[in-house]
Amino acid sequence: HIRNMAFYNLPLRMLKLVQDSIDESQAIMTMEQAVWRMTGDQADWFGIDAGRIREGDRADVVVLDPTAFDQDLEQVHWADMENFSLERLVNRNPGIVKHVLINGKFAVRNEQLTTERGKEIGFGTFLRAK
């Protein structure tokens, strides 16, 4: 359903769960392992060349502020969908996602969507399986 596409925040919930387990001295994995599970591990499983930071690769990077994980990640609300007469459930967690780079271009900078996102070429590409 188009209304339910953007409200679960699984990656943020996983990172918070891991951080909470570390803070309670009962680590289920390291933070590095958690990030790997959501990036390189999944890329390997799907057979795509992604999920790693290497010289010469696309720069697909998300910069998070780990001190902002103290908020409720489960709070959802309704928001209007641009260009549609619909609303959708969203989960906004201010302060956590600082920057998002897609192919080296800022899609989010200082927690704000950039105006170039979706209008300029180079913000992404189809990733073929190996």
Residue ranges and their predicted role:
Residues 26-33, 87-95, 126:
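Glycine-rich, flexible loop segments associated with nucleotide phosphate handling
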Residues 51, 98-99, 106, 125-130:
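Ligand-binding pocket scaffold of soluble enzyme catalytic domains
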